A protein has these predicted regions:
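A short, solvent-exposed loop/turn motif at the edges and junctions
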Residues: 62-68, 90, 94-111
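Structural signature of eukaryotic scaffold interfaces centered on beta-propeller domains
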Residues: 268-289, 342-360, 420-428, 486-505, ...
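Short, conserved, GDST-rich strand-edge loop motifs in beta-rich repeat architectures
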Residues: 186-194, 295-298, 365-396, 436-464, ...
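Short, ordered, surface-exposed loop/turn motifs in non-cytosolic proteins
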Residues: 40, 48-64, 88, 137-153
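Beta-strand-rich domain onsets/edges
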Residues: 20-41, 45-51
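Short, acidic Ser/Thr/Gly-rich low-complexity loop/linker segments typical of extracellular
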Residues: 36, 63-85, 106
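Conserved beta-propeller blade signature
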Residues: 292-296, 362-366, 428-434, 507-511, ...
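The canonical Cys-X-X-Cys-His
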Residues: 174-185
Length: 726
C-alpha cells in the first residue's frame, strides 16, 4: 500500500505534528541563566518581535581550531536552546529559521549564557532565500503528459526517446543533473552575470550547460531529454523566479527533529568534492571508536582525506596508481566556467568513488589503479574460471587497500569494474563490487587475498542469468537479445549501481538504473561463477496489477530481515520484501513486473513539480540510502535513512508509521550527501556515544552558500532526548 509521508512530531512531552511554517508561541520567557548548562555549553533563549521562536536553528561557528568547526541545534517550544560540548574556542552565534532572516552575529565563549534576538523576515521574498533548493525547483514546469512521446527537435523539442512524462522526471532529477549537484539553489535558479550577455534566457541556459570540464556530460544529459525543450523549460523557470514567483514555505523542525545536534568540520580544498565517506566497519558499528573518518574525491583529486574528530584536524593521503592511468575528466574545459574560467579544476586519475572499512581497520576503495585494458587472465582464452564463462576485456576502476597502521597502499587488480563496494558477513570477508556500466558482478575473497596477495586467484565474477526454465539450477542460457527458450535459462544485460549482501540469507542485491529500473537478487550458490542465479524485480509502473507506482531506483541498502530499501526518482522511498511475492520467483513469467505486491512506497517530504503526474511524489532528489541496522542514531534498529539531496537533509523513516524525521542541515545551504554510516563510540554514553556520519558531496562546492572558496564539510548527526539535553 502507498503510505503518505508526515513530518514527524513526536515529543517527549507530547505535542502534535504541525505542517506549514511553525508559528512561534508566546509562552513566558525563561531566563537564560535558568537553563542547566556546563562550562563547555552555550545556552539561552531566542526571541523575536513576536516572542519566543520555536523550531529555529542556533549556529555556533569557530575558526580557532585545527579546521573550520560548527555546531547547530534547534530551539524548543519555548525558544530555548543549548549547544553542548563545544571545544574551547571563541564562537560566532546566530539564529536562522524559516520565516526569519539571519540574526546579527554575536561573539561568545562556552560556559556563559547567551540570549539571541531573531529577526522576522521583512518579506516573503527575503524569507524564501533560506528555503532548500527543491522547494525552488518544484516551480519547474514539467511538460504535460500529452506532449509524450517526444517528437524531436523539429517537433515539440522533447527527444523521441522519451516516451512518457515519468522518463522526463527521471532525467530532471536523480538520473540527470541532480546525480551531481542541486538544482534550485541560488547558484542554479539564477543566471550569473559572469556567464555573459544573451538574447534569451534559453540561450543563457544552453551556454551554461557547456561550462567547465563536464560541459560535455551536461550537454549529453540535455540531449537525452531533448535539448531544445529542456532549455525552454529551465529558462521559463528562471524567468518566473526572477519575476518574483516564490515556492511554498517548508515547515520548521518539529518533535524529534528539534533534538538533533549537528557537528561539522571543514575538510579538503575548495576545488575538491567528496563522493563517499566511511567511519566504521559497517558489520561492527562498535569498531573504530572515536577514530578517524575517511573520504574520497572521485574525479576531483587523487587524495583520500582523513578527519580526526577528536583533534579537530584533517590531513590528506595521496592515492597511488600506475603509469598510464588516464585522467577521469577532460584536460580542457568545453567552455569557460563562470567560477574558474578556463582552469580545469578536476584533476584525478584514481577517481576513487567509494570506500569501506574492514575488520582490521583498513580502507578499501573503488579506484582506478591502471589503464582500462585488462590483464590477460581476465580475457578470452584465459584459464581463469570466471574468464572461461564470461571474459572481460577492460575495466574502468579496480580496487586498492590502505593500512593505517603501516600507512601503505596496496593495489589490487580486478577484472570487473568497481563503483560501490560492500563486505559480506561470511567467513571469507568477501568484498562485492558494483559495475553499473557492465553486465556482471565481481567479488574479491579478501581472506584468500590476505593469505596469498594473489589477486588473480582471489577474485571472480559472473553474469546475471535468470532461471527461466524454472528447474532451480543454472543451465545453458540464451543471450539478452534472443527470445526465451523454455529449455534454457536467459542472461540479462543489467549492471548493479548499488550493491549489498543480505544479512538474512547471503544473497547479493543491487539496483539497476533506468526507467522504470529494478532491484536484482543474485543467489551465488556453491560456485558463483557457474551456479549464481539472478532474479529481477522492476519497480511497478503502468502495471494495472500494482497498488503502487514508481520508477528509477538508485541507492540501496538492506535491513537485518532481508528487506530491500531503495530511493526512487519518482519521489519515493521504497521497500521491496521478496517474502510477500505470491507468484513464481523464477520461470518464464518471472521477468520483472511479476511481484508488484513486494513493493511499498513512501512519498518523500516536500512539494511536487508543477503539472506532474499525480503518481509522482516530491520534487526532492534522493541519491542514496542506508539502513541503521544496529541503532547507531537512536531511533531504533533497522531504520532506513535516505539522502534528501534537494532539501539539505537526511530523512529517517519509521516503517511502522510511514512518518519521516527530517534532519535538515541549515548551514551552509547546499548539503548534498551521497553516503552515510553510523558508529557507536561508547555504548555506555547514551546519545553522546552514538552518531551518523556523512559529508557534503556535491560536485560543485562553489555552489554552496558562501560561493567560490567554500569547502566541503564532514557532518555528524546526533539525537539527544530533548532539545536542552547536555
Amino acid at each position: 500500500m502507498t503510505k503518505k509521508f508526515f513530518y514527524v512530531a513526536v515529543v517527549a512531552i507530547a505535542i502534535a505534528a504541525l505542517f506549514g511554517v511553525s508559528r512561534p508561541g508566546h509562552s513566558a520567557k525563561k531566563p537564560a541563566a535558568a537553563i542547566p548548562m556546563n562550562s563547555s555549553d552555550i545556552a539561552g533563549v531566542v526571541t523575536s518581535s513576536k516572542g519566543p521562536e520555536a523550531g529555529v536553528w542556533v549556529i555556533a561557528e569557530t575558526k580557532d581550531l585545527g579546521t573550520g568547526y560548527r555546531k547547530i541545534v534547534v530551539t524548543d517550544d519555548q525558544g530555548r536552546y543549548l549547544v553542548p560540548d563545544l571545544p574551547k574556542a571563541n564562537y560566532t552565534l546566530w539564529v536562522r529559521g524559516y520565516g526569519l532572516v539571519d540574526s546579527a552575529k554575536v561573539q561568545a565563549a562556552p560556559g556563559k549564557p547567551l540570549d539571541l534576538k531573531a529577526v522576522i523576515a521583512p518579506s516573503a521574498k527575503e524569507a524564501a532565500q533560506y528555503y532548500p533548493a527543491a522547494y525552488w525547483y518544484s516551480l519547474l514546469h514539467i511538460p504535460p503528459k500529452s506532449d509524450f512521446p517526444g517528437t524531436g527537435p523539429n517537433g515539440n523539442g522533447i527527444s523521441d526517446n522519451v516516451k512518457e512524462q515519468g522518463q522526463w522526471v527521471e532525467l530532471v532529477k536523480t538520473d540527470g543533473c541532480e546525480s551531481c549537484h542541486q538544482i534550485g539553489d541560488k547558484a542554479t535558479r539564477e543566471i550569473p552575470s559572469s556567464l555573459g550577455a544573451f538574447d534569451t534566457t534559453a540561450a543563457a541556459w544552453d551556454r551554461r550547460i557547456q561550462s567547465a570540464q563536464v560541459g560535455g556530460n551536461m550537454v549529453t544529459t540535455a540531449n537525452r531529454m531533448g535539448r531544445k525543450r529542456a532549455m525552454q523549460e529551465y529558462a521559463d523557470w528562471t524567468d518566473r523566479v526572477k519575476a518574483g514567483e516564490l515556492p511554498p514555505a517548508p515547515p520548521r523542525p518539529q518533535g524529534l527533529e528539534r533534538n538533533i545536534v549537528i557537528t561539522q568540520w571543514d575538510w579538503a580544498g575548495p576545488k575538491e568534492y567528496f563522493h563517499d565517506e566511511i567511519s566504521v566497519d559497517r558489520r561492527n558499528v562498535n569498531s573504530n571508536p572515536n577514530g578517524l573518518v575517511y573520504g574520497v574525491h572521485e574525479d576531483s583529486s587523487d587524495f583520500m582525506t582523513v578527519l580526526d574528530p577528536v583533534k579537530n584536524t584533517f590531513s590528506q593521503i595521496a592515492i597511488p596508481y600506475k603509469p598510464g592511468t588516464p585522467m577521469a575528466e577532460p584536460e580542457q574545459v568545453l567552455e569557460p566556467s563562470p567560477y574558474w574560467g578556463k582552469e580545469p579544476v578536476a584533476i584525478s586519475h584514481a577517481t576513487a568513488h567509494s570506500l569501506m572499512m574492514d575488520s582490521q581497520g583498513r580502507i578499501w576503495t573503488a579506484a582506478a589503479t591502471r589503464g582500462r585494458e585488462n590483464p590477460a587472465f581476465c580475457k578470452e582464452g584465459s584459464n581463469h574460471p570466471s574468464a572461461k564463462v564470461f571474459p572481460i576485456a577492460s575495466s574502468s576502476r579496480q580496487t586498492n587497500v590502505y593500512d593505517p597502521k603501516t600507512k601503505q597502499w596496496t593495489l589490487v587488480d580486478m577484472c570487473s569494474s568497481s563503483q560501490h563496494l560492500m563486505f559480506a558477513e561470511d567467513a571469507n570477508n568477501t568484498l562485492w563490487f558494483s559495475d553499473p556500466g557492465g553486465d556482471k558482478v565481481g567479488w574479491l575473497n579478501t581472506k584468500m587475498w590476505d593469505a596469498t596477495h594473489d589477486a588473480e586467484k582471489s577474485q571472480g565474477w559472473t553474469p546475471f542469468v535468470l532461471d527461466t526454465n524454472g528447474n532451480g539450477k543454472r543451465d545453458d542460457y540464451v543471450e539478452p537479445d534472443q527470445p526465451i527458450d523454455p529449455s534454457k535459462d536467459k542472461r540479462i544485460k543489467v549492471g548493479f549501481y548499488a550493491v549489498g549482501p543480505s544479512p538474512a540469507d547471503g544473497s547479493i542485491w543491487g539496483t539497476t538504473l533506468g526507467f522504470p529500473g529494478a532491484v536484482v537478487r543474485l543467489n551465488p550458490g556453491s560456485d558463483p561463477t557457474k551456479t549464481a542465479l539472478a532474479e529481477i524485480y522492476e519497480v511497478p509502473w503502468n502495471n494495472p496489477k500494482a497498488s503502487v507506482q514508481g520508477f528509477s531506483p538508485r541507492g540501496m541498502d538492506i535491513d537485518r530481515n532481508g528487506v530491500i530499501w531503495t530511493v526512487l526518482a519518482s519521489g519515493h522511498f521504497a521497500s521491496f520484501d521478496r517474502r510477500k511475492c505470491k507468484g513464481p520467483l523464477n520461470g518464464p513469467t518471472a521477468t520483472g513486473q511479476h511481484c508488484p505486491e513486494g513493493w511499498t512506497l513512501y512519498r518523500t517530504p516536500g512539494p511536487s513539480f508543477k503539472g506532474v503526474d499525480e503518481r509522482v511524489g516530491s520534487a526532492d532528489t534522493n541519491y542514496y540510502n542506508w539502513v541503521d541496522q544496529y541503532d547507531t542514531f537512536g531511533l531504533g534498529k533497522n531504520i532506513p535513512i535516505a539522502t534528501a539531496n534537494g532539501t539539505d537533509a537526511l530523512e529517517a523513516l519509521d516503517p511502522a508509521t510511514g512518518k519521516f524525521i527530517v534532519m535538515r542541515v541549515p548551514y551552509p545551504m547546499g548539503f548534498f550527501a551521497k553516503s552515510m554510516d553510523g558508529r557507536i563510540d561508547d555504548p555506555k554514553a547514551g546519545w553522546k556515544g552514538k552518531g551518523l556520519w556523512s559529508t557534503y558531496a556535491t560536485r560543485t562546492p562553489w555552489h554552496l552558500e558562501g560561493g567560490k572558496g567554500t569547502t566541503s564539510k564532514a557532518v555528524k548527526f546526533q539525537l539527544r532526548p530533548d532539545p536542552l539535553a547536555d
